Structures are given as C-alpha cells and as structure tokens.
C-alpha cells in the first residue's frame, strides 16, 4: 500500500541522515577499526565496504547512536535502526533492486512492531532492550524474505535468532555505548540466522511461545502475553 511505502521511505531517509551525522563519533570509529573484513556492503558516510554482518552492525549502531531514530510506541521499539541496515546490506550482498529492498523492510518491520504489542513494557521491565530482542526477529524474517527462504527455513531462522538475540539495559548505570550497539547487533544476527537456516540448520518452531521461548525468558512474567497480535488482521 502507498501509505506503507511512504512511511518506509521516510524511515529510510531519516536513517541515512542520522547515520551520516554519527559517522565520526568514537563509538563508530572504534567499530570500523575492529570490524575490518572487506566485502560488498556500504558503510554509510565512509569510503569503505565490508561484509554484510559487519555493515549491519556498524550502520545500525550509527542510526541509533544519537537517539534520533524513529520510534514505534508499542513497547517502544526503534524499527529503522535494525531494519534499514539489515536489508541494505543483504540487498547489496546479493544484488537486489529497490523493490525487493522495500519488501524486506515491510516484512521485518511488521514483525518487530507486532512482537512489541504482545506484552507491552514486559521486556524492558525484565532488564532487556526491546529493540535488541524483537529487532533480531524482524531482521531475520526480513532477510529470509530477500533470500527466498521457504516457510520452514523462515521458521528455523526465527528459532535460530532467538539464541542470538540479546541486549541488557545495564548501560543505564554508566551511560556506555552498548545501547547504541544493540540495533546493529540485531541487524547482523538477522543475516546470520537467515543464512544458517537456508543452509539447513534447524531452530525451534516454538521460539516465541515455548516454555523457554522469548516471552518466558526475556519478559516480566506478571504481564500476560497476547500472541494474537502476531497474526491479527493478516
């Protein structure tokens, strides 16, 4: 739908702007110095290309770095700082056009926002960063759609990324840069998990609702999850 495309284009433009604004910050230069493997994926604002995983991490960190990225007030979560770097690097890595780029953004962004509505505030109250946790799943499903993964492979990708998702909010104690890193890490894990699944690696199908799944592990247990938000109106 046009309104969805218009919103995503706005998020993409905003994300590119804040990436450029943060390009010379210490937390970005330190990541560039650490993640040096060359590849085909752009580091926005820099004359350098790296592999998809590293590009996702660095660009995602830059988008979220100064906290001017978009916000969905469901939990809340920051969609652009995960999805734009994840889909940009993936599209570049496998040489896809702008239409497929937008498709990947739609698929992943939708899942992040829906997961954020399942148990509002519960993840944050448990001590985790919702963008870091839910973002990994959006990134995984978005990248899976670009790779042409089957339904079973997409399901495995989500199960796999459940063991990669992370992000504690202890950065609040000292104001360190791990908060900035969280969306980038989630973006990179989407690339890894989708490719693992495409290659035949299996992940649990009950990653969201299972006894040891996301909402029983990362969410405050006195807030009852409503899983209908994941599939309602589809």
Residue ranges: model-predicted function:
Residues 1-234:
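N-terminal core-entry segment
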């Amino acid at each position: 739908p046009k309104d969805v495309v218009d919103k995503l284009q706005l998020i993409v433009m905003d994300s590119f702007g804040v990436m450029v604004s943060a390009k010379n910050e210490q937390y970005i230069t330190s990541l560039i110095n650490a993640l040096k493997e060359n590849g085909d994926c752009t580091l926005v604002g820099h004359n350098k290309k790296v592999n998809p995983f590293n590009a996702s991490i660095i660009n995602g960190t830059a988008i979220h770095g100064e906290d001017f990225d978009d916000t969905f007030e469901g939990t809340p979560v920051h969609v652009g700082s995960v999805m734009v770097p994840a889909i940009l690097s993936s599209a570049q890595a496998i040489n896809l056009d702008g239409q497929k780029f937008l498709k990947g953004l739609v698929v992943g962004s939708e899942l992040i926002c829906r997961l954020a509505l399942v148990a509002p505030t519960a993840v944050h109250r448990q001590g985790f960063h919702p963008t870091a946790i839910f973002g990994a799943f959006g990134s995984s499903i978005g990248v899976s759609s670009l790779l042409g993964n089957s339904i079973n492979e997409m399901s495995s990708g989500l199960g796999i990324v459940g063991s990669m998702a992370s992000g504690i909010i202890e950065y609040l104690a000292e104001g360190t840069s791990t908060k900035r890193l969280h969306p980038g890490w989630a973006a990179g894990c989407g690339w890894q998990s989708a490719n693992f699944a495409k290659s035949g690696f299996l992940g649990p199908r009950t990653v969201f609702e299972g006894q040891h799944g996301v909402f029983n592990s990362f969410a405050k247990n006195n807030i009852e999850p409503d899983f209908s938000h994941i599939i309602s109106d589809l």
